[in-house]
Amino acid sequence: MISTDDEQRAFDALIDADARIEPRDWMPDDYRKSLIRQMSQHAHSEIIGMQPEGNWITRAPSLQRKAILMAKVQDEAGHGLYLYSATQTLGITRDEMTEQLIEGRAKYSSIFNYPTPTWADMGAIGWLVDGAAIVNQVPLCRCSYGPYARAMVRICKEESFHQRQGFEILLTLMQGTDAQKQMAQDAVDRWYWPSLMMFGPPDDESPNSARSMAWKIKRFSNDELRQRFVGMLVPQAEVLGVTLPDPNLTWNDETQQYDMSPIDWDEFMEVLKGRGPMNAVRIQTRRDAHEDGAWVREAAAEYARKQQQKEQAA
C-alpha cells in the first residue's frame, strides 16, 4: 500500500518536472481547495461578466455591433461552462458552485461590479478588462492542473478576439466627433484603475499568490502581471489617442518598467466585500436567471431519465 508520504513525493516530483496533475492523480487537500477556489471564482466571473455587456445588446449602435456583442457574450457563457466542468473534476458539483454564487458566498472578479453607462464602456471593457484577462490567463495555459490548463487554451484564443473588438470600438470613437472622443476618454478613465486591480492585491498582501506559484498553478506574481499589462497598454493608448489617467505614469530606465501612482486598494476591498456600485444587482440578476431557468433544468433531467429508461428496456 502506498503511503501518504510516497504520494506527496510523487506529487512534488510532478510539480518539479513541470508535468500535469490530472483528476485521478493524488493531490494534497490544500492544492485541491486552492484550485476549487480559483477555478470557481474564474467561472463565476465569466458568468457574471455577461451582464455589463448584455445590457448593451439591445442598444448597440448598428446591427453589426449587435451581432459581434452577442457573439462575445455567448463566448463568456461558454467560458463559464468550460470552467465549471473543469472545476467539477475536483469533486465539487455545479449545483454547489451555483448555490455559493447566488447566495453571495462566492467571490468573482470585482471589475464586473461597475456600471456601463455608455457604448464606449463596451470598448473600454474589451480593451482594458479583456486585455488584463489575457495577460492574467495566458500563463494559466501552463497551469499544473491539466483540466484548467486545457480549458484556458481555447478561452485565451477567444479573449484575444474580445480585446481586439474593444480596441476597435475605441479606435472608431476616437476618429469621430469631439463628443465621441470624450465618451471614449471618459470610459478609459472609468475602467483603467479597476482593470489594474484585476490582478489582485500587491504581492506582499496577497494571501494565496505565493502558494499558487509554488504549486505552479500561477506562473507570475500579481505585481509582475500588472507591470506587464501596463507595458502593453502604453503604446496601444498612443495608437488610440487616449490618455491613461495616471499623471505619474513614467518609464523608469533603472528598473526597466513603469512607475505609477498608488492604487486605491480601499476601493478594491470595498467592492470585494460586496459594497460596489453594482454588487447587489449582479447577484440578484444571476439569482433570478437561475430561478427562471429551473423548468429547463427539470425538463432536461426528465428527458435524460426517460432516455435512460428506453435504453435499459431495449
Predicted regions span which residues?
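Glycine- and acidic-residue-rich phosphate-binding/metal-coordinating active-site segment common to enzymes
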Residues: 143-194
